[in-house]
Amino acid sequence: MLRIHRVYLMAVLTDTYGDVPYFEAGKALYGGSATPAYDSQEDIYNDFFKELGECIGILMKGNNDAVTGDVTAYGGDAKAWAKYANSLRMRYAMRISDVAPEKAKAEFEKAVADTCGYISSNAENATITYIDGPFTLYDGARDLDFRVNALGEMLYGQDSDSPTFVSATLFNRLNDRKDPRLYRICRHYLNPKRSAVKADDAWNVDVTEEVVAYQNSDKGDGPHPCDIGAAWWHNWVNAPANEDIPTLARLVNMYPEVGFDQSNYNARMMRPFLSIQLEKAECPGILMTSTEVKFLLAEAITKGWNVDGSIEFYYKAGIRDAMEMLNQYYKIKAITEEEIQDYLNSTTTEGVSPESIKEMINYEAWILHLMNPAEGWANLRRSGYPTLENRYNYPRWTSDFTYDDDDLTTPVRLKYPNLEAKYNKANYEKALQKLGGTDDWHHRVWWDTEPDHVTPLNP
């Protein structure tokens, strides 16, 4: 179990930074080096396949003693862990498919053929359980608690005056496609007294239906997600009259001391928030899902790999699983069968070019990976989809922000942590040499060969 999870975590690290310490990493306590060498991403990925294959072999012997301290939904089930490991093998094979196509094909087909199987339903998803603890990303915090809901920790916002809102990048795509997930993922709240450390219902008053009705009325002017590259206060949204939002009017009358219509809280409710139902302690942490596996199988068929079934089947089955997973894991208004079927009827891969199919599959994967942002970013870079807005077409808010980099193209890696230069200086500098001497956001990692897909520059 630990070996499988180490592969998962090290994949996040190498996908984020590129070359990282791997073979010598984490061994100082046991007599190893405290200054581990950086290994190439290619060598790291090759070891992933070796590790996962060996783990599957051990687990398929049915020895549950190989799985101890399990904090996932699998409850120590060795064969469930084998399916998870095999599904990860499919993920990482697809990841290297542009840079090492023969290796990728061989590993993917090996996973498909393995008798251990792979994650094929939401009941088999790999998830972890969070503790019911406070968020630690608030004003003055020094550390992050990785045991609490990760989406909530990073995206809930620091306090009632520093919330996080949904950008037009996500909102407009869901809205334009009449996607039933839109107002399950996004909600509107009145929350001047909300907790800084917990996604609570008490002081996040949901006014979504009232706000949407107002925005779609003669008085309104449509939805107002945050502009690309902007803060929520840019391109200011005017608040409606209190009586236009009945809950607002009622709360102002009942609790005048709270200030529901003061300090712009009534204007903030016009911006969509990420639903707090995705940020609560009881929500699972997503590692690997049947939806992702089905999308991987669909894309594998487009590459001519040996996979039974059709692109259309896996594509639509993946979408269905994604919507049903939202119903299963989160306390949202359930997406109905009619809504699911209407959405499925609106999209098809039949009669579509292979590149367009790739875009369709990976757009849906992008929506799915909202719950697993590291995987979402990695898959976007690997696939090149969805097409992003060209940041150069949008304002630079220099009066509010400091720009550390004049290159506004989408980052393709993160800079190494600053402490590496202090505590592992020699190896850090060797790693920089492979980057051309500069630790920046724009040097692609080994497997990232796909050109960025962005909208054209405005004339």
Predicted stretch roles:
Residues 1-5, 9-321, 325, 354-356, ...:
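Structured, solvent-exposed acidic/aromatic patches
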